[in-house]
Amino acid sequence: MEIALLAAARSSHTTALLPCEEDSGYAIDINFGGKTFEVVFDTGSSDLWLAEQGFKCVNVNMTSVPAANCAFGPLAPPTFQDGKIPNENFNITYGDGEFLTGFMGYENVEVAGITVDKQEVALVNYAYWEGDNITSGLMGFAYPTLTSAYKGTNPAVDNTNTTDALYTNWVFNAIDQGLISPMFSVAMERGSNGGGGQLALGGLPSISYNKTFTSTPLHIVELIPDANAAKNYSFYTILPEGYVLEGAVESFWGPQEIEVERKTDYYAIVDSGTTLMYLPPHIAEEVNALFDPPSVWIEDEGVYENDCNATPPKFAVRINGTDFYINPQDILITGEEGYDPSTGGCLVGIQPSGDGIPNIYGDTFMKNVVAVFDIGASEMRFAPHEYY
């Protein structure tokens, strides 16, 4: 269903999206306890955390390495202005394998002119992190179901014999306190165009774009092993009608072509914290096969790569009757971040899901739409934003 969305319920508070490492991620500025920090903007997780002064940096094998290896920006003071929460710690592992632990406490946090007082946040004192030397942490905008606080003081036993300490994260507190309407929207743009886009709280971005939106409901689906996610909203999960691929002939795949019980193969997370798109393996394989020349699967890396001058096929995601095409420059990552010196090839922006990775519409997709995360209506809306 297409709808003309002319105005949000309330005036919008906006802040710039700041591209990181050639658009492999996006950040926002926040005021945390009276100081400004740049943090990764992530709609695929829920916690707000900063690395603290004196933290311990480790490698993937949990061996201590110099703090510079974690590549954080400015570090936060190791205390909470509004107090530490007794017997509660922070422990999170992200989909790419990065992990962090620390403690929970309260701080006043401001984003885009909106301040939530005594927001529950984390200070990280132990981290395996592959940073960018700019961002100091991360701010998650997903549902509180995915928050990563635990009762106790020993993160080593979290997820075994400890109890989740679910809490209300920043964006949901801002909504619950009536500070913003129950929505936010994202207009992510390529940094090569001189900007990065905009995050709008409680309304729509102020940039120029096609304001005809297509809506689709959010779904409660347990895409990761989490009993809470089986009965509550967690990720911003949608069910597309399918995918359109134009090579020699037009091809279309969609969940209506398979058994109802396998529709979970098609659910997808809209996630600003993931660089690429991860799609059902047979679809990713077909997309990569129709490059000119065809992409190559690099077994050691577990990814598709191609010649950096290859021509991608036309590819679109079909959502509720509307085809959202992905700009070719987002389908093949040709900058420094996408170049593989060991093969001389470039990373493809569409990769297979599976092996614990759900279908994800990351920045490859989000740079081609304006996305409205309508929490109040339990739906998402998309407008095309392929060219700008």
What are these regions (language model features)?
Residues 21-134, 312-314, 321:
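Signature of the N-terminal lobe/flap region of pepsin-like aspartyl proteases
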Residues 55-85, 158, 216-221, 285-301:
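Cytochrome P450 catalytic domain signature, combining two hallmark sequence patches
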Residues 126, 316-388:
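Aspartic protease catalytic domain
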Residues 43, 50-54, 59-63, 132-134, ...:
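Short, solvent-exposed loop/turn and secondary-structure capping segments
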Residues 30-34, 38-41, 48-50, 138-139, ...:
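Short hydrophobic beta-strand that contains or immediately precedes a catalytic carboxylate
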Residues 1-21, 117-259, 347-350:
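Aspartyl protease catalytic domain
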